[in-house]
């Protein structure tokens, strides 16, 4: 056995994580914007294939449930999780339409569609991105190395510079958690403001109002 070879996975992750740190500001901004939109009644739609589908569902679970501290639930849907709709659409319209048709059904102007793909080239995600932009949704993506077609099809993309799909997916999970942390931070800040008592009018103001 070669210990160095078995540690290569960790070495690849460490190297990619160092480059990934520059993405922190993007995730913080996304989390804040998402908190504002979902807090105002918008919803998040998320989609991915294979391992990326699992990551997508992880994100929606954190938002509908909770990430760390208790807070109200927010509307977030993982499109692949509705297996009956997904298989029916694939059977009747083709696999390329499984996410686009659901985006058309559930998406509204002002909503956010987040797409996860290690390759950045999945046809069904590209179709969903086009449909979302037609509707007036904002489209974000987590992908593998740039450039890639999905990056070009979205409003904004965070592209992980790592050659292995496994490493990309691992950093996508980091991105999901950082996004949720920023989301919760903004939610807590807004809740703190709403809990503050309204300032009492000064005696002078009360007296002037009585005159």
Language-model regions, residue ranges each:
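Generic N-terminal amphipathic, Lys/Arg-enriched alpha-helix
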Residues: 1-22
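A short, well-structured juxtamembrane/interface segment
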Residues: 19-40
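Hydrophobic beta-strand scaffold residues
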Residues: 44-45, 139
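Compositionally biased, low-complexity intrinsically disordered regions
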Residues: 199-201
């Amino acid at each position: 056995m070669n210990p160095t070879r078995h540690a290569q996975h960790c070495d690849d992750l460490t190297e990619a994580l160092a480059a990934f740190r520059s993405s922190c500001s993007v995730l913080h901004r996304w989390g804040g914007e998402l908190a504002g939109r979902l807090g105002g009644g918008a919803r998040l739609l998320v989609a991915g294939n294979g391992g990326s589908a699992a990551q997508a569902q992880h994100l929606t679970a954190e938002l509908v449930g909770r990430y760390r501290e208790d807070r109200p639930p927010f509307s977030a849907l993982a499109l692949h999780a509705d297996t009956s709709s997904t298989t029916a659409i694939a059977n009747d319209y083709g696999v390329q339409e499984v996410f686009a048709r659901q985006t058309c059904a559930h998406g509204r102007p002002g909503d956010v569609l987040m797409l996860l793909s290690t390759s950045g080239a999945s046809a069904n995600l590209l179709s969903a991105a086009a449909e979302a932009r037609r509707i007036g949704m904002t489209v974000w993506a987590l992908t593998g190395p740039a450039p890639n077609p999905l990056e070009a099809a979205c409003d904004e993309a965070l592209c992980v510079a790592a050659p292995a799909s496994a490493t990309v997916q691992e950093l996508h999970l980091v991105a999901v958690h950082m996004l949720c942390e920023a989301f919760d931070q903004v939610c807590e800040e807004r809740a703190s403001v709403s809990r503050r008592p309204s300032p009492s009018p000064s005696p002078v103001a009360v007296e002037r109002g009585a005159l």
